[in-house]
Every structure is written in structure tokens, then in C-alpha cells.
Amino acid sequence: MPAKLNSPSRYHGIYNAPHRAFLRSVGLTDEEIGKPLVAIATAWSEAGPCNFHALALARVAKEGTKEAGLSPLAFPTMVVNDNIGMGSEGMRYSLVSRDLIADMVEAQFNAHAFDGLVGIGGCDKTTPGILMAMARLNVPSIYIYGGSAEPGYFMGKRLTIEDVHEAIGAYLAKRITENELYEIEKRAHPTLGTCSGLFTANTMGSMSEALGMALPGSASPTATSSRRVMYVKETGKALGSLIENGIKSREILTFEAFENAITTLMAMGGSTNAVLHLLAIAYEAGVKLTLDDFNRISKRTPYIASMKPGGDYVMADLDEVGGVPVVLKKLLDAGLLHGDVLTVTGKTMKQNLEQYKYPNVPHSHIVRDVKNPIKPRGGIVILKGSLAPEGAVIKVAATNVVKFEGKAKVYNSEDDAFKGVQSGEVSEGEVVIIRYEGPKGAPGMPEMLRVTAAIMGAGLNNVALVTDGRFSGATRGPMVGHVAPEAMVGGPIAIVEDGDTIVIDVESERLDLKLSEEEIRNRLKRWSPPSPRYKSGLLAKYASLVSQASMGAVTRPA
């Protein structure tokens, strides 16, 4: 059954003549005003390569929708470029931007009575922000990822942006020269597009396919590929079928679809940020998803894709062997996916994967068989315990450490921790604690890549890190994030002291502060929250509305 259209009540009939007058002013004809009016929401910005080309992609998407008999109008959303904000106040706006993007798309869509939605994203928060809006609106919707950059090269080594961050630590430790750092900087990100490894942007692009909200194979072509343009146009055309058949986003974004996405995340060893984002998208879709679902699926799902930072390959490599569908098909054949879920093609996941054209090339060096995994368990594990009663996240795909016990080195901000690593305060065997960097505390739950890269770059291979902040998808090593409750609301991480023993136990799924329950209670009684860092403006508003990381750090009405 065709979807019920919003636009006729706004643009048809005598009383809507003023509205039509404005549509004529932007070039629409009587015939075009009579067609379904669809939105092209594009996350476009010139402040970084990830979304620089998104406006051009929007024009291509418009062509596709016109071929499908629709009338498209495009609008931009905001973009916060994570890499440019890294290690600065700018990173506090990153996660905030996810929810702002969702709000912006909702406002534009409803204010102008659109009938369907094409979303175009790139950098880390744009994909989840747009998918959250699609889930919230529950209208015919389809997503297309803008694509990753091609990898860089220096002295025979393939580079990603991760290498630049770690090169700073290597330079400070006098392991490389300033000129070598400069050459790495110049060569690491040679084209438009998102970071080339399976960091957060490529992880979420992959999730759009796994959820069934994007065309099969559309996540992996680079931003510079002609196939990227083809997929964008086909995405626009596909929206016509969704409207014609009345398929809305929540018919696709079911609990089973989220299980498929989590399974894919675990198999690919994707970014820990996807845990936050899938929880948030599920919240907007009215689907009850919890951290326990992630661990349940992680236990049964092997890690099979050798993708940076945990492995050896980048998104362009995965594209050459068939893209995300190669991973999905292996999981489906092993009985690990729900093949009967509906997707934006109007077909089931199983039908899509059976009809997909896989290149006839070897792929086992990148994507292994389920029976011969890189690791028997999925790439992300949820930890709980006396230090994180509501949960914390570790990316086991990017570390071989399964148990770590060490003395705490406590910092109350990322900046203090970075200075501490720089000055040699951190010693092998210690656990760096960075607190008051959670959703409410920072606010905005910034990523700690500057610190983790400094640790790795300095050659501190036996140091762990625990934080109520986040990590970049480029982070590797024994790093635990998303600790909940966060320090700002009185979580146990707030009362850790230098020299306390911290235990990270992946096999037992535990994160513990080695103190008696009585001592923890007594310290919490003595604790009082610090003054908020922001008392006005966007970040202050956000801090008053945001939930804990264990709930996806979504903003909710006060």
C-alpha cells in the first residue's frame, strides 16, 4: 500500500496557494508540486574532508529521486569534524552534534511536510544522527554513506589518520624526527572522504547496511570512486519504491535488525562508539536495546574481519573483495543473522545477499570464515563491576590483553592526562584514570585519542586506560571507556585515588576497583560534585538533558 503523503495537506488546494508560490520561486512546476515531495538531508561542511563532497552527492541523489517520479528539495545539517576537534574544547561538541543533527532533520522534515527522506552522511556523528531522525520520524527513508578516503603511504607503509596521532607520541619520545612526523602528516589522508580504517565513520556506514537502511554494498566504495556516485543515484531512485510500497523506517529498524547490526559490529571489530549510537537509534525507533544484548551477541559472534586499527586493512581493501555484504553473507550462512528482516530494497536481508554480485577474488586475507576466526569472540565486550555498575566498553579487537591489574594514576581531565603522559608521569603497569569527561561532566563525552595515541606512540605498551569519556575508532590497546555512572553524577570512578588497584578482566566481563564495599560507600559519602564547566550555552543545555552512556547518551526532555 502506498505511503500516506504529508505534502498534499500543505501544498494542494486553494488555501495553500501561498505555500505553492514559494515552491514556484525555487523552480518547481505544477507537475512537480503534484508529485511526492521528498527531502535530501545532507551533512555538508567544508571544515574537513569527510563531508566536503556531500553537497555534490545531494545533487546526484536529487537526480535519482526525480527519475523515480519524486520532487526533491535538499537541505544541509551541521557537521562537527571529530579529527579537527580532537584534544580540544571542540571535541565536546562532537557527540552533542549527533543529537542536534537528529533534531535538525526532524525539524526540517516536519516543518516543510515532506513525504520521504534521503540521508547523506560521512563523519562520525552524521550517520547515527540522520538514522536517529529517520527512526524518530518513521517515514519512508533511506541512507547513503559518503565514503572513506583512500589510504596514504610513507616509506612503503600504508597510513591512516591514526598514524599521525601516534606519530606525535613517537616524536615526543624521540623515536622519530620532526621531519618524519611532517611527512606522515602530509601523506596520511590524501583524498576527500572519511578516515580510511574501520574507525567510527566506516563502522557506522557499515551499520547502515547491517540495519537494512542502506543499499547492499553502498558503505565500502571510497568517496573518490565512480561507484560511490552510482550508489547515491540508486539510493534516490530506491526512495520512490519505499514510498510506493508504504515502507517506513520502523518496519526496517526492528529488534532483529539491531541484533544483525550488533552481530556485524562484533564480527568486524568496529568502533566502540557504535555501542552508543545503536542504543540511541534503537531508542528513537522505540526498540528496547540494552548493553546486555551486546554481550550476549558478542559471546556467540567470532571476530573475522582484519580491519584497522585492530587488523591490517582499510575500507578500500574491503570494497575490492565485495564490501560489507561479504561479512554479512558469512554471518548469514553461519546462522548468526536474521535473514528474514525487511530492508530498504523492499526485499529481505537474505534475498539481498543471495542476489548481490560478489567479485570473484580471494578475500580470506581480509574476511575469514566463521569457523576460522581471528578471535572466537566478538570485537567488543561490555564490562561491569564495582568501578562500572552500569557498564563500560572495551574493544578487544584492538588488544590482546584479556586481564590487566595495575595501580591507578588519576586525572580529572583529558588535558591533565595528556600532560602527564608527555612529562613521563605514567609508568608501565599503571592504569590511567581520566574522569569528569562523561556525557554530563565534560560535557559531551569527548574522545581520548590524543592520550591513547600518546601512550602508544611513547612505547608504553603495558599501560591501560579507564575513562567515563569515549574513544576514537582509531584507538588501540587495553582502553576501557563509557564508564557508567560517570564521575559527574557520583559514579565510583569519581572516588578512585592514586595507587588504588584496578582490575580489568575481559573473560569475566568485569571492571573492578579493589576496595571493600564499605570503603567505596564511605568515599562516595565524602564525595561532592565539582562545579559544572559550563553554566550557559549549548553545552550547558546538553548536560541538563543527556542520559548516561549505558543508555546511549541520548538527550531526553527534562
Swiss-Prot record:
Its EC number is 4.2.1.9. Gene3D superfamilies: IlvD/EDD C-terminal domain-like. Disulfide bonds: none annotated. [2Fe-2S] cluster binds at residues 50, 123, 195. Its cofactor is [2Fe-2S] cluster; Mg(2+). PROSITE patterns: ILVD_EDD_1, ILVD_EDD_2. Mg(2+) binds at residues 82, 124-125, 447. This is Dihydroxy-acid dehydratase. It comes from Saccharolobus islandicus (strain L.S.2.15 / Lassen #1).
